[in-house]
């Protein structure tokens, strides 16, 4: 039974990584709090206060983010870092999400990101770690480049875990990077991330 549950969890995370990697270029990102739920339809209050209708696609993977310590980031870890570009060419980490091994390679690369003005997202492998009193320095390498990150001691660090549909309930904060706008204005999500234990998905 335990092995079967573990296999199911790995399969779910693999489905999630495939869905992220295959998101269309016009995908809409949704960040907000669930106001109500009606089967597959979620009413989500966005950061600007607008109520968004988010419909989960059939078999859309649901995953949770859970807080972990910065020490869980290891050399060789595949991570995503939201960051702000610095004048010296480095990036200052705003948050770090550690991908499980089953999701290695998800969205690999460096790109602009809409969490904050001028913020970036880098999904890559940690190749170097240097600790100091003011925080850590991480070097991340992806297929066609690398970036250096300054990591404050209090940075938010999370990882992913499979989640049940029952975790999608009013008051819970959610995020999806892969929603498609339908003709009626509804957003169809091919995957969704829920903040477990009151966490706001930081990406």
Model regions: which residues?
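Bacterial N-terminal signal peptides
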Residues: 8-17
